[in-house]
């Protein structure tokens, strides 16, 4: 359903106190009977910001952004007063050229651990920045006695710019690229029963939509089995987790329920793994 259609259905069923679960929508009107299963973008952003604040070893923070993400860069600057802002180079007409130079970043780095936020939806820019950062990560200066600059890359908004053909996953792994996500990737070595059954039936491993459909359906069924209804299950089963997704519903003061649980993950040896906190 589109958000408009979903809101219409939820509105019509609200008078019957019938719960309505949204599998993928985030910008919904939370009627009292609505369960928004997909975490909001704000929750994902908060997860990354809290991760940055919790790491006491971080000695320097850099925010790299393009013009479209100036508001996000300024928000991060308010969260981290020490943060240095680096923006895309611009043309004579003032338009983003979606690149930075080695010198742009090198001057902002410090010895020790540096956390670098990259905020963009442009794949070429993401490719340029990650390449430059990878070349500077733990670079040893034979003429200096200072420790090298360790770079950890993060973003508050994971999107297709970080997943395209121009992106070098080796660079992302070397930079320990961290981001928040609604779902983690299942480990094929875990011998998961659902994955095995799906593969046997369709001769292919399930994609994210298939896994999410299973996780969400299983969650609703188990909540109904273990509680009188979905509403009471929020207290009886405050956190549930399945193949790739977890659900921890909270109720808005005036409105329905939203999923308050997300994963923090990172690239490690060319795979995406959960960061245990």
What are the residue ranges of the model-derived segments?
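Extracellular/periplasmic periplasmic-binding protein-like sensory domains
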Residues: 130-212
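Periplasmic-binding protein-like
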Residues: 1-2, 21-23, 60-66, 111-129, ...
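Solvent-exposed loop/turn segments at secondary-structure junctions
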Residues: 2-6, 25-29, 67-71, 122-125, ...
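Sec-exported extracytoplasmic/periplasmic mature domains
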Residues: 14-18, 53-57, 81, 134, ...
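Extracytoplasmic ligand/sensor domains, especially the bilobed periplasmic-binding protein
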Residues: 3-62, 68-76
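Segments of small-molecule ligand-sensing domains
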Residues: 203-210, 221-276
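Glycine-rich, charge-decorated loop segments at or immediately adjacent to ligand/cofactor-binding or catalytic sites
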Residues: 30-35, 98-102, 160-173
